[in-house]
């Protein structure tokens, strides 16, 4: 050990973890050590830069709360979250996209046709579609979990004066695999910009805007669940989303609903517009 140098220390560190808990853990840890050491050698990382990086990570931990996970935000703006989604989009299902920091697992079970906007003003949108398998068959009883920002670009969970469960819904598809509900059109917003990740974006002369979107988590028995987003054609940030979440296949078209149009659903609130988007679930492995 006393004879290690900058070229042999990598193997020495890997060898020090002799008692591995699993083959997968061993593989991941070895690769992490290798890439971290390679980065240090390739960049000739200074001690000041090394310490700055550690302090940056410390600051990410300090500002994090159960409602705000700065490390997820860091992963998002570095494209790591998006890359993980791309690597894990398999089997012909709908492409994955960012979970984001504002998902709550206890969203209320919501009847089809409900209005999750809770009387908020703005453009009222009918969000609807069919959940299918990869053969095109509808999936009755699939669970469609959704959450979003409001018409001012805020999630209710960010505002103590609002009910954190507003603008969220958990729907079960009907016998035809359909989901449908109304909500308010969300607004583009910036990711949290007041912490270390915001400092990183400013240092890189990057904007912090997200293209407006709905979040979805969709699952069904014996199918692989998906976490994804639906974006809106023509949005200002569709080609420069701060967290690299947009995929061409996830862009929906917002269509105006005439006031005298006959709608195929029984809805709690009359919509001004609609976005039709089908989800595809692949079989579970």
Predicted regions, residues:
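Beta-strand-dominated extracellular/periplasmic modules and repeats
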Residues: 2-285
């Amino acid at each position: 050990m006393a004879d290690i140098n900058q070229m042999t220390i990598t193997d020495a560190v890997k060898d020090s973890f002799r008692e591995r808990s699993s083959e997968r853990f061993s593989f991941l840890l070895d690769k992490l050590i290798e890439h971290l050491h390679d980065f240090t050698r390739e960049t000739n990382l200074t001690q000041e830069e090394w310490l700055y990086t550690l302090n940056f990570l410390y600051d990410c931990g300090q500002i994090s709360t159960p409602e705000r996970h700065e490390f997820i935000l860091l992963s998002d703006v570095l494209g790591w979250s998006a890359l993980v989604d791309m690597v894990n989009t398999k089997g012909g299902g709908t492409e994955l996209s960012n979970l984001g920091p504002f998902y709550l697992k206890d969203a209320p079970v919501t009847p089809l046709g409900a209005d999750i906007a809770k009387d908020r003003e703005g453009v009222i949108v009918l969000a609807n579609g069919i959940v299918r398998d990869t053969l095109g068959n509808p999936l009755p009883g699939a669970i469609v979990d959704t959450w979003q920002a409001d018409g001012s670009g805020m999630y209710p969970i960010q505002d103590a004066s609002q009910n954190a469960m507003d603008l969220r819904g958990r729907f079960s598809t009907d016998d035809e695999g359909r989901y449908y509900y109304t909500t308010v059109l969300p607004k583009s917003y910036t990711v949290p910009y007041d912490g270390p990740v915001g400092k990183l974006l400013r240092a890189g002369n990057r904007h912090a805007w997200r293209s407006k979107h709905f979040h979805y988590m969709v699952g069904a028995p014996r199918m692989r669940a998906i976490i994804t987003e639906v974006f809106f054609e023509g949005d200002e940030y569709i080609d420069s989303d701060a967290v690299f979440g947009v995929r061409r296949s996830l862009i929906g078209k917002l269509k105006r609903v005439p006031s005298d149009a006959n709608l195929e659903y029984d809805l709690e609130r009359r919509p001004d517009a609609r976005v039709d988007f089908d989800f595809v679930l692949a079989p579970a492995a």
